Each structure stands twice: as C-alpha cells, then as structure tokens.
Amino acid sequence: MILNTKTLKVLLIGGTGTISMPICEKLAIDPSIDLYVLNRGHKALPTGATQIICDFNDTEQLQDVLKHYSFDIVCNFIIYKPQQAIQQIELFRGKIQQYIFISTVATYNHETAICIDETQEQNNIYSQYGQDKTKCEQLFFKAYQQFGFPITIVRPSQTYGYDRIPLSVKGKSCWSVVERILNDQPVIVHGDGKSTWHCTHTFDSLITLSN
C-alpha cells in the first residue's frame, strides 16, 4: 500500500493495548506520521502522539469529537461486536484512504487443520469472540463490495509482550498463573499439554502493521 502524501494523518482507536502500544510508540516518532490516538485516556501516550479522549462506544460523542479532524488512515483495535463495525463504516465512509480492522485467528475453524492461512474456513463454533469478529469482517467486506470502503483486515494470534507472557490458559491477566508458579502449584494447560498452539510477540505484530 503506497499513499502519495508527505505526512500521513493516522488515527489509532485503542492504542494502549498489548498489540497497539508498540505500534503507537513507533508511529509517534516517525516524522512522516501525524499520529492521533482515541481512547478514554486511562494510560499515558508516548511523546509525539496526540490524544483524543472519547468513549468509542458512545456514537454521538464520537461523531461530535471527530468532526474537528480528518485522517488518512484509521486503525481500530477494539471492535468486538457487529454494531461497532457498522458504526465505524458509517462514520468513516468516504472520508479516509485506508481502514485497518484488527480481527483475530479465532475466526478460523481449527477442527480440520493445525497449520492455517487465509484460505481456511471461518466457522469457529467454539468461540463467541471469534464468531463476533467474523460478523464484523463480513460487514466490512460488504461495505467494500458495495461502495469501496477501503478495508484491510489483520488476524493476529494470541499476542504477548510488555505485561503478558505466552500462556494458553490465563484468564484476563497473567498474574494468577505467575502466582501459581511462585507457589509451586500446578498450571492449567489446554488439552493434554502436548497440543500445538501458536502465539505472537507484540513486535511481530508491529512489523506487520507498520509496513
């Protein structure tokens, strides 16, 4: 993807999570990028990023805040439900050059294959999270087909980095597992502990998205 402009105005929605923070840090020091980050303002941003404080799920507030800005690229890390995808399509239709939706490998059906690529069937009956992300993808594809909405979809695997270690069963955070290790207690694993599982370091996601 090559965009013919000297300085790109980039908006990250989210921007302070496991996947998004390293991307935010890299773009913030890139002289060719004018970086904006929209979130609720609970975490500090790196120098060079302009923060827009807003609740992404409050559509009226979001519309009111963003009417003062224009962007070339929007990357959203926090779409989980179809209605959020619809909101974003309606909000940015005809206004941007590229929209990047961070989806997940949990959309894929893993029953028929261990090693998968983009051709794998998307029908994960075991993950509501994956099913919802699939519905979001379908809405973005439909928008692309109907009126050329400039969508790019990225499907990371489970990601570890700053404050997360590569664990397959951990709950919302890693500390409970670390505490069990420190206390010489058994650690829960998926299956019999020998099954294949893939994870991605946050800097690998950074390379993919920043390019």
Give the positions of each predicted feature:
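Flexible, glycine-rich beta-alpha linker
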Residues: T152-S173
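Rossmann-fold cofactor-recognition segment
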Residues: G48-D58, I78-Y80
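Alpha-helical substrate-binding/gating segment
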Residues: V178-I188, K194-N211
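N-terminal Rossmann NAD(P)H-binding glycine-rich loop of SDR-like oxidoreductase domains
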Residues: L8-D30
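Active-site "gating" loop of Rossmann-like NAD(P)-dependent oxidoreductase/epimerase domains
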Residues: T104-Q128, K142-Q146, R164, V169
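N-terminal Rossmann-fold cofactor-binding loop
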Residues: L38-H42, F56
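Active-site Tyr-X1-5-Lys
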Residues: Y126-I153, L182
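NAD(P)-cofactor binding segment of oxidoreductase domains
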Residues: Y69-C115, Q131-K142
